Amino acid sequence: LNPYTVSVFGKKYGLDYIVAVATKKEYKRQGYMRRLLDKILIDMNSEKVPFTYLIPANKDYYLPFDFAFVARKNVYDVDLSSFKKSVLRCVKPECKEACEILRFINNEVSKDNDVYTYRDMHYFERELKEISSEDGFINIYREGDDIVAYESFWGLEKIELKERIVSSSIAKREYGKENIMVRITDVAEFLSNFRSSKDIDIIIKINDNIVEAQNAYFRVQMGKDFANIVKIPDAKDSAFVEFDIADFTAWIFGYNDDVNFNIVNFVDKSIAKDS
């Protein structure tokens, strides 16, 4: 697990990025990976951690644990040849240039994302070490004094693009292959960051076969400047919307509207959909 600072609607969380889960050949097929991941997810819930995330080498390893894709890889169709380019191989953390790079990246990634990895100096220092360890480098493109694009490359045998971020003033961000998977570990904590343009009061039922603490009903009350999320024993005769946790994750992150859900006891089902 690698810790990162993640901004969720402006609130900063220390969340764990799962780098890899692997089992030695002689220990495979004995349930070690499942028990380890189950324990991690349950512990995160007890610590009110809203979610964990990863970039999968093989999505099929993580689908049984109710991870869901929430984002695609950023792609930019842009010609940067007309901009002033600097190639950086040794950037000292906390120098002026490092601060400029961080400011540029955070400004760009926050424009269209309510949830994003917040780059602080600790993050950048670790990033520089990773790039350096594989003989990598950074490209910075400027228009006048302003950074308009950032690229990082790495690879001992074959140089590969690690990340590219381009200013929205010169290029429109497009989306490539599915990239990031998320596993919500505390529904109530995650939803507490949301706001609604109109007041809502609705019950949702989450089906979670791993994190039993959130295999439950939640009453969601929300408005422009408040959110109150409470777990309740049952819905009784009240209307509610039911999701499996993976479907809820893909839907609430705005990645996929076409997920499975059940609308129960609503006279007018459009009310549930609008909420």
Indicate where each model-derived feature is located.
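A conserved beta-turn-beta hairpin within the catalytic core of GNAT-like acetyltransferases
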Residues: T5-I18, K28, L156-K162
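Hydrophobic pocket-lining residues that define ligand/cofactor binding sites across diverse proteins
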Residues: Y27, M44-N45
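Hydrophobic adenine-recognition pocket in adenosine-nucleotide-binding enzymes
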Residues: V21-T23
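Amide-forming acyltransferase catalytic core, primarily the GNAT-like/NAT-type
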Residues: R72-I202
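C-terminal hydrophobic structural anchor segments
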Residues: D201-W251
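Conserved acetyl-CoA pyrophosphate-binding loop and the N-cap/start of the following alpha-helix
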Residues: Y27-K39, I170
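Conserved active-site alpha-helix within GNAT-family acetyltransferase domains
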Residues: S46-P50, P56-N74
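C-terminal interaction segments
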Residues: P233-S275
